[in-house]
């Protein structure tokens, strides 16, 4: 979503003369002006793709559901003390500008030319970063992939397909709740079949995704980006290899519901890297929590940094303070790591820190870190690269499934009252 910020016209400066509440979401509300603005964004995005633009009324239910989920995640972030500093925000804005082949100044000028507010754009990016960190803590961190799963995957036909084709896909999901009755499942199957029949007759996929799909990317036309066959539910791997670009798959049942995929592009697989740069690094991680906010966490990381600079032992302090369960008992030692397997902020600080020098405290989505580089080397890592690639595929697959389950869960557990005229009332 961030990369498309400029192109989608995501932030409007116009002030609505009248406003009203369209949904109560736990301790917050969603205003009609917010919904109307997001509807316009979606319509502009669809129009820029050359698709038929649905009327606002057709998009409102999807948009409102997206806003409700975003609001719930932002409230979670607030309760957990998750913050995005201005420095991090500036870096993210710079990345967005770079993706659009602009400097930050050119990006600001382009926003102004389109009648968009730079400050509003910054706040939207901030919100998306907070949501990303909430998901990291609530979903990604609890996903585990065993070494045996990796070995089994690499030995499987699906694992071997890792090295072959990639597919640029869009999807339409007709969701079924975990406890759905047989009648509800049958109704979803009938709806999915009806959509598939429309697509085979030439209906616009982007428009149907925006108005009918329950997938998180529905308002982006269902665009999933590039995926390996192994990252997809099993029914789709064989279909896509022999399917022409532009075609759609029949609906397939998955744990989350019935999915239809459209093949937008194909490309061949890439060869395995033979050599890999590795860094031997150790770190201390301090995480914010509901009882220790970001500022207090930063101060604690600074105190630990000062103690190491004053001669205290890094490993002993890591054992006492670090909240990385995978390395704390080893004195913070991460051993030899591939920089590309690390989050960008950690990777950047590590690359800029000379060997044997302690970094100043810095922040990532996990919390505040202090690191020390113990060594650098280049090694033949063909087998490790294959294992890491398999690990990433399995983790991404589990993440996609777990995220959808978690989003349904927080929606079901929240108090939500819909006040949009003509919409179904839902209060929990």
Curated annotation (Swiss-Prot):
Keywords: Chaperone, Isomerase, Periplasm, Repeat, Rotamase, Signal
Domain PpiC: 164-265, 276-375
UniProt xrefs under Pfam families: Rotamase, Rotamase_3, SurA_N
Signal peptide (from-to): 1-13
Entry EC number(s): 5.2.1.8
Subcellular location as annotated: Periplasm
GO cellular-component term (any): outer membrane-bounded periplasmic space
Keyword Signal annotated: yes
Region (Disordered): 211-230
InterPro entries reported for this sequence: OMP_Chaperone_SurA, PPIase_dom_sf, PPIase_PpiC, PPIase_SurA, SurA_N, Trigger_fact/SurA_dom_sf
Main subcellular location of this protein, as a coarse class: periplasm
GO process terms (BP): Gram-negative-bacterium-type cell outer membrane assembly; protein folding; protein stabilization
Catalyzed chemical reaction(s): [protein]-peptidylproline (omega=180) = [protein]-peptidylproline (omega=0)
Organism domain of life: Bacteria
One term of GO molecular function: unfolded protein binding
Domain comment (free text): The PPIase activity resides only in the second parvulin domain. The N-terminal region and the C-terminal tail are necessary and sufficient for the chaperone activity of SurA. The PPIase activity is dispensable for SurA to function as a chaperone. The N-terminal region and the C-terminal tail are also required for porin recognition.
Function: Chaperone involved in the correct folding and assembly of outer membrane proteins. Recognizes specific patterns of aromatic residues and the orientation of their side chains, which are found more frequently in integral outer membrane proteins. May act in both early periplasmic and late outer membrane-associated steps of protein maturation.
Name listed for the protein in its UniProt record: Chaperone SurA
Gene: surA
């Amino acid at each position: 979503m961030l990369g498309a910020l400029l192109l989608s016209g995501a932030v409007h400066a116009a002030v609505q003369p009248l406003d009203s509440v369209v949904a109560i979401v736990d301790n917050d509300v969603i205003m009609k002006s917010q919904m109307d603005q997001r509807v316009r964004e979606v319509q502009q995005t669809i129009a820029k793709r050359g698709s038929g633009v649905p009327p606002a009324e057709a998009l409102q239910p999807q948009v409102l559901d997206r806003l409700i989920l975003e609001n719930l995640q932002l409230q979670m972030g607030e309760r957990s003390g998750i913050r995005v500093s201005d420095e991090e925000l500036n870096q993210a804005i710079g990345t967005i500008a770079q993706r659009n082949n602009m400097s930050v100044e050119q990006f600001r000028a382009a926003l102004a030319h389109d009648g968009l507010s730079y400050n509003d754009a910054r706040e939207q990016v901030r919100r998306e970063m907070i949501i990303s960190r909430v998901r990291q803590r609530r979903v990604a961190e609890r996903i585990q992939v065993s070494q045996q799963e990796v070995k089994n995957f690499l030995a499987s036909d699906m694992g071997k397909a890792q090295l072959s084709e990639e597919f640029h896909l869009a999807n339409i999901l007709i969701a079924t709740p975990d406890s759905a009755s047989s009648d509800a499942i049958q109704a979803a199957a009938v709806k999915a079949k009806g959509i598939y029949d429309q697509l085979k007759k030439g209906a616009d996929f982007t428009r149907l995704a925006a108005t009918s799909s329950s997938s998180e990317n529905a308002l982006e036309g269902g665009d999933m980006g590039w995926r390996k066959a192994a990252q997809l539910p099993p029914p789709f791997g064989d279909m896509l290899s022999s399917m022409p670009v532009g075609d759609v798959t029949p609906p397939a049942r998955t744990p989350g519901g019935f999915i239809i995929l459209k093949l937008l592009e194909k490309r061949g697989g890439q060869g395995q890297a033979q050599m890999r740069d590795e860094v031997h690094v150790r770190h201390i991680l301090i995480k914010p929590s509901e009882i220790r906010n970001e500022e207090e966490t930063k101060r604690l990381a600074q105190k630990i940094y000062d103690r190491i600079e004053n001669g205290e032992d890094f490993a002993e302090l890591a054992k006492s303070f670090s909240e990385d369960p995978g390395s704390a008992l080893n004195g913070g030692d991460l051993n030899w790591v591939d920089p590309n397997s690390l989050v960008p902020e950690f990777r950047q600080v590590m690359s800029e820190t000379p060997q044997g020098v302690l970094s100043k405290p810095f922040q990532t989505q996990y919390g505040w870190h202090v690191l020390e580089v113990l060594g650098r080397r280049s090694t033949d890592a063909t087998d490790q690269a294959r294992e890491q690639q398999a690990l990433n595929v399995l983790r991404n697959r589990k993440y996609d499934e777990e995220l959808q389950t978690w989003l349904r869960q927080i929606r079901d557990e929240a108090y939500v009252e819909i006040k949009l005229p003509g919409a179904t009332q839902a209060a929990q």
